[in-house]
Structures are given as structure tokens and as C-alpha cells.
Amino acid sequence: MPEKKIDGRRKAAVLLVALGPEKAAQVMKHLDEETVEQLVVEIANIGRVTPEEKKQVLEEFLSLAKAKEMISEGGIEYAKKVLEKAFGPERARKIIERLTSSLQVKPFSFVRDTDPVQLVNFLQSEHPQTIAVVLSYLDPPVAAQILGALPEELQTEVLKRIALLERTSPEVVKEIERNLEKKISGFVSRTFSKVGGIDTAAEIMNNLDRTTEKKIMDKLVQENPELADEIRRRMFVFEDILKLDDRSIQLVLREVDTRDLALALKGASDELKEKIFKNMSKRAAALLKDELEYMGPVRLKDVEEAQQKIINIIRRLEEAGEIVIARGGGEELIM
């Protein structure tokens, strides 16, 4: 019987499942994150692997000829175990969250193939809630481009509705899709996922140009100051300091209390710590390293409060035009 032709990515997935979580994790440690994500999608969708397919793959990889266990069906739980062993629970959780969308068919796929200018012309006549649902399913840079091109009186209302979205019922999404289908394109919906929320609104705002972002936020502050503050808090997190240039970091450090800086860095990545040390004098960096070393255990609440103080300083300096935070926002759409 001639060998069945197996897709390369599926072969890799079959091999990893055959290896078991421990050894598969060791292999994954040597792969880049994009490849890991592609393989996990394949593993999660692998279905039942026949003994013939397993034999064919293992014979191709001679070093695995003595594999002892039957291949399991795979699935997201298996993928999660492998990732946890390879990268630890936290990073595994983040990868799985990103992959969830890859394992589902997203609604509004026809919208992603529509010219942005045409989409703006169409959406601006829709109800703000409809626009909010549609934008929540788009990638943040695309959603930001469309939001920025909507009439000003719509922008704040739509962002507010995106931020307040949590779970949209499948019936509502289906109804919106049916209506859009008649006007734009045919689409058959199959599955739905969590959409919208403050994080989505913040991501979209991060991808807007500074002028549009400020106009929307100023208006939102007047209409719903609590929501505006919550969105603003999510728009810049402590690790985003990595996006600042050296001059901006130095300006920030001049205004930060040393104790607050040490506390804030207690919960920071090594990459961020190194960037901070690099922008200090050798003596100041040495003193800060000593303080970090001898600080001992600290409460997470204290670390977060210290980080928030520094974020507030960064926001104030940006508002004053003294520093610039790298943001998205491509060319504006001219209507």
C-alpha cells in the first residue's frame, strides 16, 4: 500500500503528540513562538491519528522508532500541558488565549476583506452598538483606522460601547451578520467568542493617532469619567516603558522616587530592568541593584501602586509634550 501523503505541519504535530508532554516540551523550547503557536493549533485540531499514520511518521523520524505510547487524540488540554511544561503556566495561558481565536471561525470575516473606506461609508449609517460589535471582531489596528475615520460625534459613543461590551449573545451577532450580509457579502456564522470590553477599547485607542485619541478621550471624560480613567489605565502598562526611547526614560527617571522605582522594578522583566539601568549613571544603577537585592519579599499591591505612580508620571509628561509614547495609527482615511 502506498504511503499516504501527510502535510508537513500535521507530521510535526503527530510527532509531538507521540513524544508525550515532557519530550514535546523540550522540543518546543527550541522553536520560536510563532512556530509553537502554529503547531499547537495543529495539535488541538489533530483529531484521531490512525496507527498507520503514526507508523509512517515515526519511520520518517528514525530516532523515535521505539516510541511506546499510542498517539492520543490531542486537543486543547494536551496542548496546554505541553505549553505549561515548555514555558510555565503564565506564558502558556497567554499563548492559549491567543490561539483560541485561531481555533474558531470568527464572525464578520467578510468585513476583513472589505475596503476600509467602503466599510466606513457603510458603518457610519449603522447604529453605534452595531458598529461597536463589528469593530470588536476586527484586529485593533484596523478597528482604530475605521474608528478614526468615523464622524467625530460617533467616535466616542462607539468606543464607549466597545468598552462596555462583554459577552454578545450568538443570536444578536447572527442577526447583525444577517443584516450586513444583505448589504455587503454572504457569510455563514458557526462559532462565537468573548468580544469587546475595556481591554479591546484600550487596544484600539493605542492604535489611534495621538490627535484622534485625545479628542475621543476628552469627550469621554466629560460623558463617563470613570470609564475614561479605566480605559486610560489599560492603554499603557508598566512593561510598555520598553517602548520609550532612552531620552524619554531619562526624563521620567528624574521625577521618580528611588524607593518607588525599586518597588516597581521588583515585578518587572529582566529586559525592562536592564533598560532602566542603562539609562542611569553607573553609581545610581549600582545603588538601585543593591536595593533590589536586599529588599526581600514585598506585597504585590505595593508593587502595583509603585508602578502606577510611574505610569502617572509618564502620562503627565506625555500630556505636556515632553515625551512621546510610540503608538499605532497609520495614514488617516480621507472621506
Swiss-Prot record:
It is a peripheral membrane protein. The record marks R161 as: Part of the EHPQR-motif. Pfam families: FliG_C, FliG_M, FliG_N. InterPro entries: Flg_Motor_Flig, Flg_Motor_Flig_C, FliG_a-hlx, FliG_M, FliG_N. It is found in: Cell inner membrane; Bacterial flagellum basal body. One of its GO terms (biological process) is chemotaxis. It comes from the Bacteria. Coiled coil: none annotated. GO terms for molecular function: cytoskeletal motor activity; protein heterodimerization activity; protein homodimerization activity. Keywords: Bacterial flagellum, Cell inner membrane, Cell membrane, Chemotaxis, Flagellar rotation, Membrane. A motif (Part of the EHPQR-motif) lies at residues 126-129. The keyword Cell membrane applies. One of the proteins that forms a switch complex that is proposed to be located at the base of the basal body. This complex interacts with chemotaxis proteins (such as CheY) in addition to contacting components of the motor that determine the direction of flagellar rotation. Belongs to the FliG family. Homodimer in the absence of FliF. Interacts (via N-terminus) with FliF (via C-terminus) forming a heterodimer. Interacts (via central domain or via central domain and C-terminus) with FliM (via central domain). This is Flagellar motor switch protein FliG. The gene is fliG.
